[in-house]
């Protein structure tokens, strides 16, 4: 049995998703250990052994992590949040030097995708149509923007739609700049053109092995109609009817129709190939006039990893089988097509313990 450690399994992030996917793999393949900074982690009952780790920004984090891996005999290490992804990336040689399989993408690609403006620029240079965008650091730089509505978001960092806003005209954009403290509280942010309609939105996974060989791709056509999946929904007052009656930003919690969607995944595979992906890659996009319009790329396992595993496309398991078990995992293996919906799950934690019991 392969001993794996999944970090940051609490909080409903992609660590939780990786854990769920590994639990869906063939029985007897894994001994799964879990870690989180929160000792009262609801997922603690789902792993063979749970350990509490410091936050990734703690200077002792790496030492504690490596000591934990040695004590548990960990063979494969999965990150569960983006601060850990960046730390694992920066310390790849140390972790791999300890004999631990680290299924993360290429260092240069991770660094590129953490900067949204640089990602957009690279896509444009490679010939893929990206929405208009600009990084701004002062209010005077807003004056040249004439492609409303726009999405205002942090220029660096990861997904989850955190701190993302919609501005429908210059007045709203200037008000947002004041609200966000442009030039004072924040040094800058990215402004990106809002494109397409909510029913054209996809989250797409393109998997390559760590040697850069293409494995498979899958898409979730998002259902952006519930409070769980929607961060922002406002009436469209721009007069641009092609954008639909409402302007909608996803919360990052994806649910919907899952399948091949070849018209979408083929274009996303071309993007991943061109970027030189070596590992998991997740592309957030809208499909407009026959073209994929990318608004974000996350070079990691997705918040839909367990959904993909439910239909037979288990990315964490595939990478372990390919690189640790030396199995032939093929290419474009078939998987089920389905609609997968999500809901909240309550967990009862007995006082004095961190063993979770789903209600």
Ranges and model annotations:
Residues 72, 257-359:
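ATP-dependent carboxylate activation and anion-phosphoryl transfer catalytic cores
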Residues 1-35, 70-73, 210-212, 226, ...:
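Preference for protein termini
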């Amino acid at each position: 049995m392969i001993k794996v450690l999944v970090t940051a399994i609490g909080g409903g992030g992609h660590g939780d998703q990786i854990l769920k996917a590994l639990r869906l793999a063939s029985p007897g393949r894994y001994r799964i250990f879990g870690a989180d900074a929160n000792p009262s982690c609801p997922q603690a009952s789902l792993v063979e052994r749970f350990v509490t780790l410091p936050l990734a920004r703690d200077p002792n984090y790496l030492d504690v992590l490596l000591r934990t891996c040695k004590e548990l005999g960990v063979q494969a290490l999965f990150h569960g949040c983006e601060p850990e992804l960046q730390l694992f990336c920066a310390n790849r040689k140390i972790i791999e030097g300890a004999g631990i399989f680290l299924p993360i993408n290429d260092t240069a690609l991770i660094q590129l995708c953490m900067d949204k403006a640089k990602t957009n620029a690279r896509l444009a240079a490679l010939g893929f149509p990206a929405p208009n965008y600009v990084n701004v650091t002062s209010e005077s730089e807003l004056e040249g923007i004439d492609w409303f509505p726009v999405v205002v978001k942090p220029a660096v960092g990861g997904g989850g739609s955190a701190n993302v806003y919609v501005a429908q005209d210059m007045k709203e954009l200037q008000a947002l700049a004041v609200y966000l403290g442009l030039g004072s509280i924040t040094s800058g942010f990215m402004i990106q053109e809002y494109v397409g309609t909510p029913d054209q939105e996809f989250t797409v996974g393109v998997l390559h092995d760590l040697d850069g060989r293409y494995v498979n791709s899958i898409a979730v056509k998002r259902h952006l109609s519930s409070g769980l999946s929607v961060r922002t929904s406002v009436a469209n007052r721009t007069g641009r009817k092609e954008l639909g009656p409402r302007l909608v930003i996803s919360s990052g919690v994806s649910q919907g129709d899952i399948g091949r969607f070849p018209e979408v995944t083929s274009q996303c595979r071309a993007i991943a190939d061109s970027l030189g992906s070596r590992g998991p890659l997740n592309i957030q996009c809208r499909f407009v006039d026959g073209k994929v319009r990318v608004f974000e790329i996350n070079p990691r396992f997705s918040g839909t990893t367990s959904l993909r595993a439910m239909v037979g496309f288990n990315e964490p398991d595939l990478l372990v089988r390919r690189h640790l078990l030396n199995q032939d995992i093929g290419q474009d293996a078939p998987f089920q097509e389905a609609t997968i919906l999500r809901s909240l799950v309550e967990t009862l934690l007995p006082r004095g313990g961190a063993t979770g019991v789903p209600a």
